[in-house]
């Protein structure tokens, strides 16, 4: 497994104004080990995101209110918005809080976002983040060097979940804090419900989707029931309606979905506007994009894919393959090929537990490295890998046009509007109604005149 982990967590890049939000509140001493990983962690999530100015101001206000109402108001918290469509938020013991633009897009009022941020503050004040950092240090010490890399620690951080008890404790602390700060204590339960809807929706269209907020912050019935009970004990907050209108107004214009600059996943296809290429993964693979690489896995975990790019100072595909990409694996004879006007080379490699189909394709100065791994390689499976490699090509004009960046815009519903009439103003997409309901926190397509709703538009 160490070899496969190295394959999936390596750090070569396929990758483009950034802003950090600070609450004006003295700082406890940072954990130097965790602090050293912050840059790598941010890079793993696509770097910092320059959110719309009204949203930045609102987040700053929310953080300041939460800190003032928290159990330790002397700690300074800094919130960084990450340029990732995934739904995630996490805290470091330094007081650094991270939230993805994907999570901001899912929230529907200031109380929901306050609940997420207060939950993470709860992890810090309860020392959960320090305990998780210690776990990470131990994992780093025990992990073979072959898995380590510039983004290795960040990847392991993502996999270190808080315990169920810690999650419930952070929920309770967070709900109590937002109520004290003047926010609706039921915001936490609403956001947990939205997370559950999102998980159901994503699970239907991408069954193996990973690394969401839910993977480390599960929205279990027990957790939702506990959140509702805690909220009932802390009633007395501001108007939900006012919170929703203000939040959605500030949110309008935020980027939505994959950043075309770093490539986008469309089912089994991966398309990259800047690098001008696409590739089709085999049937059964679910793709996940990151700034470092495209990763693909099958539902049973028996096959995997990695695609990244390097520049080797003029070396061609055969020379690139000759360098050896898999520790502990022996390459077969290298075979050159030509596909879609591009030159490439391929080989197989055999490791103790996995067999690999390797390919290098040259496009301009870039060498694209494609690695397929299988626990049990068969001739039929190898042919499907080769067919996928053969799908690598430059983009068509229509494909480039379809890769325009998307954003969320909020619109007020008219008296005659329905969910379907609102969707006529949005980009056409598969599962459009279901996505609309999830984004707007709705169980059913019932629209209220004058209320704001999120729509997805292309730039």
Language model feature labels by segment:
Residues 114, 285, 370-410:
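Surface-exposed amphipathic alpha-helical segments
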Residues 322-371:
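Signature of long, low-cysteine stretches enriched in small and polar/charged residues
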Residues 1, 11-252, 256-272, 278-280, ...:
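A Zn2+-metalloprotease active-site environment signal
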Residues 284-286, 294-297, 322-336, 341, ...:
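Extended non-catalytic domains of envelope/secretory-pathway proteins
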Residues 431-459:
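Extracellular LysM carbohydrate-binding repeats and other cell-envelope/extracellular binding modules
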Residues 397-430:
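Primarily a LysM-type cell-wall glycan-binding module
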Residues 306-309, 365-376:
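Short, well-ordered beta-strand elements
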């Amino acid at each position: 497994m160490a070899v496969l982990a190295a394959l999936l967590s390596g750090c070569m890049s396929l990758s483009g104004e950034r802003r950090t939000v600070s609450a004006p509140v003295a700082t406890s001493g940072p954990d130097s080990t965790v602090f050293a990983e912050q840059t790598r962690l941010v890079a793993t999530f696509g770097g910092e995101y320059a959110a719309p100015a009204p949203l930045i101001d609102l987040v700053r206000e929310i953080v300041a209110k939460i800190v003032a109402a928290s159990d330790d108001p002397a700690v300074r918290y800094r919130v960084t918005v990450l340029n990732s469509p995934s739904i995630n938020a996490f805290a470091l013991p330094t007081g650094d809080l991270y939230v993805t633009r994907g999570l901001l897009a899912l929230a529907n009022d200031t109380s929901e976002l306050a609940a997420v941020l207060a939950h993470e503050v709860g992890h810090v004040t309860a020392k959960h983040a320090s305990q998780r950092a210690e776990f990470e240090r131990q994992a780093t010490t025990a992990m073979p060097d072959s898995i380590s890399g510039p983004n290795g620690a960040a990847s392991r951080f993502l996999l270190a979940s808080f315990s169920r008890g810690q999650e419930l404790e952070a929920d309770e602390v967070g709900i109590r804090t937002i109520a004290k700060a003047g926010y609706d204590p039921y915001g936490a339960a609403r956001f947990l419900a939205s997370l559950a809807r999102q998980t159901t929706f994503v699970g239907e269209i991408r069954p193996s989707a990973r690394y969401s907020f839910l993977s480390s912050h599960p929205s279990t019935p027990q957790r939702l029931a506990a959140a509702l009970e805690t909220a009932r004990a802390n009633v007395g907050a501001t108007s939900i309606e006012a919170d929703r209108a203000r939040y959605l107004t500030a949110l309008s214009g935020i980027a939505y979905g994959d950043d075309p600059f770093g490539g986008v996943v469309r089912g089994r296809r991966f398309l990259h506007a800047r690098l001008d290429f696409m590739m089709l993964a085999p049937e059964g693979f679910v793709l996940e994009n990151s700034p470092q690489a495209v990763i693909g896995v099958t539902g049973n975990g028996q096959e995997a894919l990695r695609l990244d790019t390097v520049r080797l100072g003029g070396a061609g595909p055969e020379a690139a393959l000759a360098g050896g990409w898999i520790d502990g694996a022996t390459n077969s004879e290298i075979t050159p090929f030509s596909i879609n006007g591009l030159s490439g080379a391929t080989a197989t490699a055999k490791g103790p537990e996995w067999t690999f189909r390797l390919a290098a394709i040259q496009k301009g100065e870039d060498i694209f490295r494609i690695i397929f791994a299988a626990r049990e390689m068969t001739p039929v499976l190898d042919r499907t890998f080769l067919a996928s490699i053969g799908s690598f090509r430059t983009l068509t004009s229509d494909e480039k046009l379809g890769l325009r960046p998307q954003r969320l815009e909020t619109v007020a519903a008219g008296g005659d509007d329905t969910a379907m009439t609102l969707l006529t103003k949005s980009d056409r997409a598969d599962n459009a109604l279901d996505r609309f309901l999830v984004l707007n926190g709705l169980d059913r397509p019932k629209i209220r005149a004058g209320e704001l709703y999120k729509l997805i538009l292309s730039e």
